[in-house]
Amino acid sequence: MKVMGSLKSAKSRDRDCKIVRRKGRIYVINKKKPRFKARQGY
């Protein structure tokens, strides 16, 4: 999982990427290609 400052580029890497919010953090998840997972962290 990548930790990124902005998830805009992470969301556009694949069309199946979705943004979800869990426990106050923002994640990009992708069920078909899990290597595209990312989390926003400052």
Swiss-Prot record:
InterPro entries listed in its UniProt record: Ribosomal_bL36, Ribosomal_bL36_sp, Ribosomal_L36_bact
One GO BP: translation
SUPFAM superfamilies, alphabetized: Ribosomal protein L36
One protein family per Pfam: Ribosomal_L36
One term of GO molecular function: structural constituent of ribosome
Keyword Ribonucleoprotein listed: yes
Domain of life of the source: Bacteria
Span of the signal peptide: none
GO cellular component, one term: ribonucleoprotein complex
Assigned protein family: Belongs to the bacterial ribosomal protein bL36 family.
Protein name in the entry: Large ribosomal subunit protein bL36
The organism of origin for this protein: Anaplasma marginale (strain St. Maries)
Encoding gene per record: rpmJ
